[in-house]
Swiss-Prot record:
This is Cytochrome b. Binds 2 heme b groups non-covalently. InterPro entries: Cyt_b/b6_C (IPR005798), Cyt_b/b6_C_sf (IPR036150), Cyt_b/b6_N (IPR005797), Cytb/b6-like_sf (IPR027387), Cytochrome_b (IPR030689), Cytochrome_b_C_euk/bac (IPR048260), Cytochrome_b_N_euk/bac (IPR048259), Di-haem_cyt_TM (IPR016174). It comes from Tympanoctomys barrerae. Gene3D superfamilies: Cytochrome Bc1 Complex, Chain C. One of its GO terms (biological process) is mitochondrial electron transport, ubiquinol to cytochrome c. It is a multi-pass membrane protein. The keyword Transmembrane applies. A ubiquinone binds at H201.
Amino acid sequence: MTNLRKSHPLIKIINHSFIDLPAPSNISAWWNFGSLLGVCLMLQIITGLFLAMHYTADTTTAFSSVTHICRDVNYGWLIRYLHANGASMFFIFLYLHIGRGIYYGSFTFMETWNIGVLLLFAVMATAFMGYVLPWGQMSFWGATVITNLLSAIPYIGPTLVEWIWGGFSVDKATLTRFFAFHFILPFIITAMVMIHLLFLHETGSNNPSGLNSDSDKIPFHPYYTIKDILGLLFMILTLMTLVLFSPDLLGDPDNYTPANPLNTPPHIKPEWYFLFAYAILRSIPNKLGGVLALVFSILILMLFPALHLSKQRSMTFRPLSQCLLWILVANLIILTWIGGQPVEYPFITIGQLASVIYFSIILIFMPATSLMENKLLKW
């Protein structure tokens, strides 16, 4: 009799995805982030569901309901901080996952990569709307500033902004719809993740060498399931340390002040994981130009397959390209720092320089270096 996991129509799919899946024998810890992102998504959906049971999406009671969750609900503080810091973990893993994809040339799986970029946009949208829900000062002003960017779109801009707001300013209608979208989007993200995996399993995983690994495959279970569990333990350790010792480390103190449309905070800034894009937005004096730079700073990921001019897939044996990639990482850290600083000298200049370097490395230096490496290797 055939094993049930191989014959049952539903269990068979799970078997081919997580148990009998042939995986390259040499994939490193950099391949752990996919499963960690899946765990993060599940954690966010579960904690979010419990928060939604006690939260009220109304301007008069939203802030109080979050306070009530933290003070009166059994382990409400834990659920709330797991959800808030879980988002930070989510983005750390996302950026590491994308960085891995760039380093090892995983973007040559076009469908998987493009769905991944769309997933990034969806997660960013979800996180932004979630940040608005506690209805603190930074929630309100963050929502006002970011939604206002759409007014830079020629002709339809101002109408579009009022349509999104549901009125003439960020108010009750905005909060209600943001809650609705924040609730539904993670389920859409889950569906997209399944498509992401479907496309990945069409080609099989990439590996650190960037070479074809069909001749040397091992079953996913038990080798990589145990490896993923180790990664999961590290994640739980980090997340719980953050939640139990310094839950507000990554938050903004301004968000402990209830939203007040008559009082603007001195420095409006998003959560840390958006600061690099926010710095790029601010470094361009023109409103529309800034918005385009902001969108393109993420959308540029779509161009990686086209900009890949090297004869080798991975950067493993390309020291010059490696050097450029690490300069890009350092540059992104500088942009993140600048995004959290006030708009004054010397931060403006540093931000503009870092923005130019960011686009130059990706669009000019990396492809040029690839060609030079081909030449040096006489390919």
